[in-house]
């Protein structure tokens, strides 16, 4: 896992599927050249955003395990674009719980519906069912 700059991180978020991504002041981490995580510190938790090169989707659990080693001891909120329900399945396997839909204001001031999932602090011990 490599810490990368905001410009590169934002470009990768857009390249790998979040076309409307605007940097919210995140710290970016690149896993094995194919998965970027944007971590945004909030009050008492981190927002976690992820984008991945679709050709290497089969490696998503390894990437998730790596970011959880770094941030799993914090409470995490996964903010997922509402047209990506498969990402919710991935988040569930990484220990994120109950799924809700919330309208949030984005960095550019627009309001959009997102899937929201939470993960309590704790170690990751492999796939959650």
What does each model-found stretch correspond to?
Residues 1-19:
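Short amphipathic alpha-helix that is part of the acyltransferase structural core
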């Amino acid at each position: 896992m490599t810490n990368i700059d905001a410009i590169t991180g934002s470009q990768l978020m857009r390249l790998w599927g979040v076309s409307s991504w605007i940097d919210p002041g995140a710290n970016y981490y690149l896993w094995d050249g194919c998965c970027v995580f944007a971590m945004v510190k909030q009050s008492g938790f981190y927002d976690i955003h992820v984008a991945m090169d679709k050709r290497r989707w089969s490696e998503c659990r390894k990437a998730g395990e790596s970011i959880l080693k770094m941030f799993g001891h914090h409470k995490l909120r996964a903010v997922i674009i509402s047209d990506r329900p498969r990402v919710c399945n991935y988040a569930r396997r990484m220990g994120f719980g109950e799924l809700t839909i919330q309208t949030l204001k984005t960095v550019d001031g627009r309001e959009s519906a997102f899937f929201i999932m939470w993960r309590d602090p704790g170690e990751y011990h492999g796939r959650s069912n």
